[in-house]
């Protein structure tokens, strides 16, 4: 393996003679002399045969994203296909999602005949290998054979199926003209990828698809190094699934994956962690990612519902910055630090629970981060060293300063984590009298001592009044339980500020409004601190109004979708 980070290892041209990683390259298939889509009658057997479509021919037709098409009935699946091809001409028909896959074959034949610009994969994955098809191998092969004859350009055969096929079955399937993808899916972990490669090699498919599950962030590194090692020896599609596998879905292309898979819409994923095609193309600009693209991310647990990737990617696009921003969910900081070095990452937005822990791994932090002991922004300098900043303090203090005089105000801060430290130190600095309540009293007492604040017990809240209540905990965040950190009787203040931004109307915000209290939602703080992060990373003024617009739009859209489902 070549030295250096993944981004440093430029792709090499496929020569057909590479021996990287100990793999030998099979002889390349001869290019079809006639149009690969033209059927040929076998005068001896009377069967219809077509020359197999070559990888070169397929690559000349496709883009970087293959959109998976699903549907409970043939009519639904074809209706979805009609919608998808308006923006995406490379699709996968997931035939295993249908109770009777053979019923859709005539419709696919007509569809592809009338739309020559569309390139299609046919997949009928059996339940035993992670799909939904309940039939036997022979039934699966019948579906794929007829899909190939109907005009599908590629057929996906799971490795376990290929290993059970007789030579005559494979020869018959290959004679139907479609390029062969032999695929392997590991829904549990990322194991020996080279071993899987060697199992697939004897079948000499036009494409190899190897998919694993990321149990941590560094599993993405394992997959991308594998792609780099073997990209000169085969046409590879490599992906890690799961919430922690997003990196491979976005950056795997520059490591050597021929294309990646995407869902047509949110909620229609055919694999764990699959991303909506429009998000990949418009927000993350996957078609423009190259070896010079800088990589940033939001790290924490959880970050599944974070809108930081949307907000920052839109800002990068608006200011023509060649960069991409990814969600990096992890429970272990050393997992992240390995990723920072290997990709390499150029900057981080740090969220719970790492705002304090990350400081000891940085070369230097700004005075504010040192003072409060929490850092939410990391930038990688040209020398590779990591430097930390805090943009949370200003993002908490400024919205409050716009509404009231902080000096002498009585403020209740809920929580004692990194965001709480920013709020408490920032508010004390402005002359406020700050009280801290946390479910773990010792953490509250420690923060109070350090910041010259006070603590308060839970039973005192209902009898106490404050000028402001500030929630710095994740309670109320989408996907986090319990729903509210306070009961209505404990909300006794002139103003309520919830740092949780997703959803906009958290349970705490709703209860405050029901009591007639003015509120500050977390969106204001979220966008403000994100804008400052953008400026630290890029040295350019942040398009703050545009960032606010896309965040509010996304949150309202999520709220509307949730209402429609309820």
Enumerate the predicted regions with their spans.
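Active-site beta->alpha loop and helix N-cap motifs at the rims of alpha/beta catalytic domains
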Residues: 59-84, 88-175, 181-190
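N-terminal amphipathic alpha-helix/helix-capping segment at the start of soluble metabolic enzymes
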Residues: 2, 42-77, 285-293
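NAD(P)-binding Rossmann-fold cofactor-contacting core
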Residues: 430-451
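Glycine-rich adenosine-cofactor-binding loop
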Residues: 296-303, 400, 404, 409-428, ...
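Catalytic alpha/beta core domains of metabolic enzymes, predominantly
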Residues: 160-292
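Phosphate/diphosphate ligand-binding glycine-rich loop within oxidoreductases
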Residues: 293-404, 503
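Adenosine-phosphate binding glycine-rich loop
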Residues: 499-566
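Rossmann-like adenosine-cofactor binding region
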Residues: 449-519, 524
